[in-house]
Amino acid sequence: MIDQKLLSILVCPVSKAPLEFVADKQELVCAASGLAYPIRDGIPVMLETEARELTLEEKEQYSH
């Protein structure tokens, strides 16, 4: 679980858009950039080189 205060101040380093926490995958997802940032040992890894691209299905799911 990620601290809600931390989540409220973190933004995607690529798009500067807000992030959504996905607990079952332990990732922070940015719908705007289509990237998912991993959380390792409770620490968000906010590097573009460490992020994975969202699938088309995921992009549709997270673009509210």
Curated annotation (Swiss-Prot):
Classification via Pfam families: Trm112p (PF03966)
The organism's place on the tree of life at top rank: Bacteria
Annotated SUPFAM superfamilies: Trm112p-like (SSF158997)
Gene3D superfamilies: 2.20.25.10
GO cellular component, one term: cytosol
Family listed: Belongs to the UPF0434 family.
Name of the protein this chain belongs to: UPF0434 protein TERTU_2813
Organism annotation: Teredinibacter turnerae (strain ATCC 39867 / T7901)
